[in-house]
Amino acid sequence: MKKKLPLNLLSALFVLAIGSSNAHAQSAFTGFYGQVSSGYESNQLGSLSTSSTTIPNINSDIKGSSASQSFGGTPLVLGIGHYWQANDKWLIGVGADYSALSQTSATFSRDSTNASGNTTIVAGSTLTYNGASMQLSNRFNLFITPAYAIDKDKLVYLKAGYSQVTAQYNRPTSATRTVNGVSTTTAATGGSQSSNQGGYLIGLGYKQMITSGLYGFIEGNYMGYSAPSYSTNTTTRASDTLHGVSSTGTRTLTHNFASLNTFQALVGVGYAF
């Protein structure tokens, strides 16, 4: 019986050593990675409110509004990052990704009414501006990504961080005035303005090794941004003197959107170095 004790003890230690080795096996995702993905992107642009104010006042101030817009398409997202092994089951990482394709809404219109105390839109008539749109481009995300290793070759992860997108507002290209059922369309100023909208990113994903280094993944991301706002100043035209003002003035036109957010559902492949 005494001779069996050392053998039993060695066997037990061997089993514990094997178990400890497996428990602390390094994840295949530890280190640098690069990846590419595509899928579907949905953008929600909040309702638009506008105002036109002229100084000195020539009784031509108006305000306008448009409904919220939804638009989407197929993105192309390029990503890089690095994972560190925190313990046997958890990794912590940092990453960055960039959306290489722009997304543009369908054109939309805005209906205008007189600002308080102004009468440039006469009773019985309407004024509608047509052909506006929004284009989103150059989206990039910077994030931290804690991950849980299901096993050496499988990973679930979260993403949280900062997102920025360039929002280009394309102003209306025409204006339609309807008086007593008769419509007349003329060219509008048009043009565009861009702003960089910052916000937050949250995401969830799953990665699985296909072969040594090569992996596939699925991912969902939500980005919420500050509301886009634009302002332009122009000099009142000589024809404005018909409203009783002989000197030139300044017209300020503002466009304020209520919100901007984006959802992405992605499928892709990557390589862990």
Predicted stretch roles:
Residues N43-G73, A100-N138, Q164-Q197, S226-Q264:
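Extracellular/periplasm-exposed beta-strand and loop segments of Gram-negative cell-envelope proteins
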Residues T184, Q197-M223:
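Alpha-helical membrane segments in multi-pass integral membrane proteins
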Residues M1-F29:
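Cleavable N-terminal export/targeting peptides
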